[in-house]
């Protein structure tokens, strides 16, 4: 039994570090890319998947790269936070393998690394996630003495796995108006199911006469199982003072579309 791969449209991610902390004699540009940066798989218990990734040295110096499998989660604002593999309840890092895990890349060189995923038998249906983290290892030149701080770059290639046929479920917990740093409508979405989903939909702003004065698409962002995410939408800066209603329509891929309304006043 095999896993099915869903290919998102994602550009390769490049980590470029300007080593401004180094003395002039030690400065060099470290830059590398990994593709793909998001892997989406689906399958049943006992399913397997094998594929490849490409790592390219975009800099002008050779780099040593180590690869590890790590857990991660998102803050309510969407910031990814990485942890040791096996920490999170929905971790799939124990199912993931990659080869090689330590290699050198000359300037301009690219390397194909192969990975595999094996879903354990008996695992519950639901969503699971992890990451292949590619990290540069500082090169130490024998006999060289420097007070420079070691600079490292890393790129996480995110892995999502859907086991079985779990149904996305969620709710809009809250909508607020925030005028502190630009006028924004903040919509808090809660994932109440066992599988991650991505946000689709929009925020529509109507005036007191019911006329639509602004419609803005929501960003295509993930909300992980057992978590909440606050989605900001910036209001038109030409919106005059007065009373308005924000109407949220959020498609999470389940059977129902989430909706919510929030009256607010622009001063």
Task: Kindly give the residue locations of the regions a language model identified.
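Beta-sheet-dominated interaction scaffolds and their linkers
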Residues: 29-63, 100-103, 170-184
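Surface-exposed binding patches on compact interaction domains or structured appendages
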Residues: 30-36, 60-115, 200-203, 207-213
